[in-house]
A protein has these predicted regions:
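Residue-level "edge-of-site" marker
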Residues: 9, 68-69, 186, 211
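Short, hinge-like loop/turn segments at secondary-structure boundaries
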Residues: 18-22, 82-83, 200-201
Length: 214
């Protein structure tokens, strides 16, 4: 039985065949609560990743994990796959930004793991469910933390002669205590394809207080 919240195939493109159940969760698409005081959002599983940021950005907040498919992927699917993105370097993947879930277990029991605070008491069943690809239960509600948007974001594009040099540079930056908000590496072929298509690319962003940005 596959019960991913998005009722879709995963990144490996496996498809349901015989003796399985495919659950369409598309109508679970509402944001239930935005709690700015506790900096969290309670949402149904088929709200898209990017929709969470859109819902809170007017108040100066955002949801950090950003898979490349964030415009379409569901938050329930993110939990099922423990999704991450460019900004996972600093802010972690879904598991680092997930506070709680409501889930229907295989025997029909409806239960909650976690809540509105990190490190809820008891066993880490929330961690067990995260990344389980929908095999342990059906997620019906998700609570995630939101972060205050940085005052200023600056981007840098840096060229290196080799992939090794690029990796060493990132390691040295982090070793000096400066963790980029996001970082991507592109080889020669990908850089050429990007430039041919868009004439521009973004590799590095770093959020900082306004008075610390050059």
């Amino acid at each position: 039985t596959r019960t991913d919240s998005s009722a879709a195939s995963d990144v490996y493109k496996r498809q349901p065949l015989e003796d399985c159940v495919l659950m369409a969760m598309g109508k679970f698409n509402k944001i239930i609560e935005i709690d700015y005081e506790n900096r969290c959002v309670v949402t149904q599983p088929c709200v898209t990743n990017l929709a969470i940021t859109h819902a809170v950005q007017d108040k100066g907040f955002y949801y950090a994990p950003d898979p490349s498919s964030q415009i379409a992927c569901s938050i329930g699917g993110n939990v099922a796959e423990n999704s991450g993105g460019v900004h996972s370097l600093k802010y972690g993947a879904t598991t680092n930004n997930l506070l709680g879930i409501e889930v229907v277990l295989m025997d029909g029991t409806i239960t909650r793991f976690g809540g509105k605070a990190m490190d809820a008491e008891g066993y880490d069943f929330l961690g067990l469910m995260t990344g389980s690809e929908g095999l342990l239960g059906v997620i019906t509600e998700v609570t995630v933390k939101i972060l205050k948007s940085p005052e200023v974001v600056k981007a840098a594009l840096i060229g290196f002669p080799t992939i090794e040099d690029a990796g060493n540079c990132v390691a040295e930056i982090i070793a000096k205590g400066c963790i980029p908000a996001g970082c991507e590496i592109m080889d020669k072929a990908l850089t050429k394809a990007t430039n041919d298509y868009s004439k521009a690319c973004l590799l590095y962003t770093s959020p900082s207080p306004r008075d610390q940005v050059v």
